[in-house]
UniProtKB/Swiss-Prot annotation:
PANTHER family from the UniProt entry: WD REPEAT PROTEIN 26-RELATED (PTHR22838), WD REPEAT-CONTAINING PROTEIN 26 HOMOLOG (PTHR22838:SF6)
InterPro entries named in the record: CTLH_C (IPR006595), G-protein_beta_WD-40_rep (IPR020472), LisH (IPR006594), WD40/YVTN_repeat-like_dom_sf (IPR015943), WD40_repeat_CS (IPR019775), WD40_repeat_dom_sf (IPR036322), WD40_rpt (IPR001680), WD_repeat-ST_regulator (IPR051350)
WD repeats: 272-311, 317-358, 360-398, 401-440, 442-480, 484-526, 529-569
Disordered: region residues: 1-57
Biological source species: Arabidopsis thaliana
Domain LisH span(s) in chain numbering: 64-96
Induction, per UniProt: Induced by auxin, abscisic acid (ABA), ethylene, mannitol and salt stress. Down-regulated by dark.
Gene coding for it: WDR26
Record-linked Pfam families: LisH_WDR26 (PF23627), WD40 (PF00400)
Official protein name in the record: WD repeat-containing protein 26 homolog
Amino acid sequence: MGVVEDTEPPLKRAKRLADEPNGFSANSSVRGSSVNSNSLGDLMARPLPSQGDDETIGSKGVIRKSEFVRIITRALYSLGYDKTGAMLEEESGISLHNSTIKLFLQQVKDGKWDQSVKTLHRIGFPDEKAVKAASFLLLEQKFLEFLKVEKIADALRTLRNEMAPLRINTKRVHELASSLISPSSFISHTTSTPGKESVNSRSKVLEELQTLLPASVIIPEKRLECLVENSLHIQRDSCVFHNTLDSDLSLYSDHQCGKHQIPSQTAQILESHTDEVWFLQFSHNGKYLASSSKDQTAIIWEISADGHISLKHTLVGHHKPVIAILWSPDDRQVLTCGAEEVIRRWDVDSGDCVHMYEKGGISPISCGWYPDGQGIIAGMTDRSICMWDLDGREKECWKGQRTQKVSDIAMTDDGKWLVSVCKDSVISLFDREATVERLIEEEDMITSFSLSNDNKYILVNLLNQEIRLWNIEGDPKIVSRYKGHKRSRFIIRSCFGGYKQAFIASGSEDSQVYIWHRSTGKLIVELPGHAGAVNCVSWSPTNLHMLASASDDGTIRIWGLDRINQQNQKKKLVQGSSSNGVIHRCNGN
């Protein structure tokens, strides 16, 4: 493998209640004439010791039994187990809601809006804004129900005498006032617009009340589910080896994966290239793998349903090493970039070269696709960035002092940002719409970069044997660093991968593949096997347990789980000479 001077931009390298909520007993009643809101608020704030409010369960003593039972009761009702929920309330002596809250909720269900507003104020919530918002919600439903049965005078009185005096949500008051001009049209629009609830949907009112009133008063319907999901997600996120779908999480035991979830066993060795393999990339649909080599060829590999990989096409036509091969957004075509030579576009199905892109007197050293697949971008040897349509017509070409020798280039999925290595230690983020540029300035030479699937992060490989993860939303900032791999002379490429791209993988000059946990930066596994520097790695976007690595030893290793290796141990490793793949020569113009 050739050595590149570190002083030059490289081609391949320089490489929380009382037992009875709110202090009310289950059989108590509250009269507005004898108890004011402040005293009720005090009752809410002071639990009754006789009810055992301070009793806790669990080994750590942080779970109040009354809250725990109420949440279970709420979940039972939500699941439709009404009899079981009622039995739990009776047996435990812990009511889901006190009598006043029960009365309030029933009044809402029955559409007794005046009574429900009065009961709301009797409860004595300390947050006046929340009470006003809840009152507005109840009165709005009252207004809409009058409107639906064409009781226009009653609707107007509700709006003028009850809602407007609250002095909140003025815009909505004006909208409702306008509806009095043509009630039927308003009702029709409200009930027929996608995503809108029917105007008489009292259940919707109850749902919205949950967002306005304290959870200690009206326990959210899905509270238990929310707690359980949060617990599972925390367990998942703290597991550095987690590399399975959420459907595999279980409530029966604490979640903890092992290294067996990380692709760490050689499943196949692909040996069709005759020289160093410099680049490889899985297709977006995960059905293919493409590789390029110093041997001046590129190969398209096909992946079967069981994960076995076989040669599909060998792409011949370049007269210099092929430094990169990139998939079109629809995976129907690939681009290959010859080292300071030409860019060629190939059809995946046939293996034919359908077009060649070049510019007189200068050559490409990097290339990429437009996100819609209808154009090509390239960094050129004369420090310019050129863009062509598929037919080779030049669309844009930036020249001059603004650009440097561009050794890596990409465009975000929305087509807004053009990302390129524009100087030895600088990455340019150019906003094509606003024509403004942001820069990521590193402390050492940048050898390559990779964008995350969501285009919010960029992984940067540096000459000093460090990989840095930058958040590029807003002002760019470093969020993590990865160390351990070896790099001194060559371009080494890294990638995101695994479940929700939770891992970082990289090649290394010591012939190993390195994998880190993305969030913590912890090195979790080193994969030996290659006999030469590992130049590039790619993680399948559809198979969480498939990783590919390209090496100077002329081979591509496919890494999988232990069980995958066992399933394939009797199968012969893929040999280029025994493949049925076809060699294609480029006749593109």
